[in-house]
Amino acid sequence: MLLYLVRHGETDWNSQRRIQGTTDIPLTATGRAQAARTGRLLARREWKAVVASPLSRALETASIIAAELGLPAPTTDERLVERNYGEAEGLDFEEMQRLFPGDTRVPGREKRSAVAARALDALVDIARHHPDESVIVVSHGGLIRSVLRKVDPEADHGAITNGSVHSFRYEDGALSLIAFDDPIEEESIEGEDLREQNPVEARERAKR
């Protein structure tokens, strides 16, 4: 069984380098174009369903992809929402550094291990509902990064760009990475690195 994780298209807060987290920020026109492009890329394969985070930027991305592929409207799963960054949400890099310098704890920030746990629970449930099929899952950069660190902890993967695709296999009760930034046989999606948009993710990567 194959799961393809897709990061949503661009939002205004992405372009402003503000931390979004669970704050519901919609797609820009650029983000909708990225979603359509990803849908056309994914059309090279056959798919059974699309599942999404209920946050509007992910759900609209998923809806655009489903329309491109002629699939039913996406279903949603609350466990696929972005990491909660607590009081850092809405801050840009300078504001983050001023209010929470260095290793200062951010009140309300969700632990990465908790994000990975709920995300993997959701992905395993999706996989079990679609044995021997391929499903697209549209979510968020912080969540995808958390899954990658759990599934492939030794690797330091690159940019998780808006609209990018990352493929996984579910087999014998375990999830494994097939390809980071999967080219779907030809090309990868151009976009901006999550860590250039989100100062929390940038700071945590620097500690590794």
Please give the residue ranges for each predicted region.
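Acidic, low-complexity terminal tails and accessory targeting/binding regions
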Residues: 71, 83-94, 149-208
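Active-site signature of alpha/beta-hydrolase-fold catalytic machinery across serine-
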Residues: 64, 146, 150
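Short glycine/proline- and acidic residue-enriched helix-loop micro-motifs
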Residues: 97-114, 199-208
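Generic beta-sheet signal
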Residues: 3, 133-139
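GST superfamily/GST-like fold recognition
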Residues: 141-145, 171
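Phosphate-coordination/substrate-recognition cap region in phosphate-metabolizing enzymes
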Residues: 36-99
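Glycine-rich phosphate-binding loop signature in dinucleotide/nucleotide-binding domains
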Residues: 44-46, 126-133
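Loop-to-helix element that buttresses phosphate recognition and phosphoryl-transfer chemistry
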Residues: 4-5, 10-60, 108-120
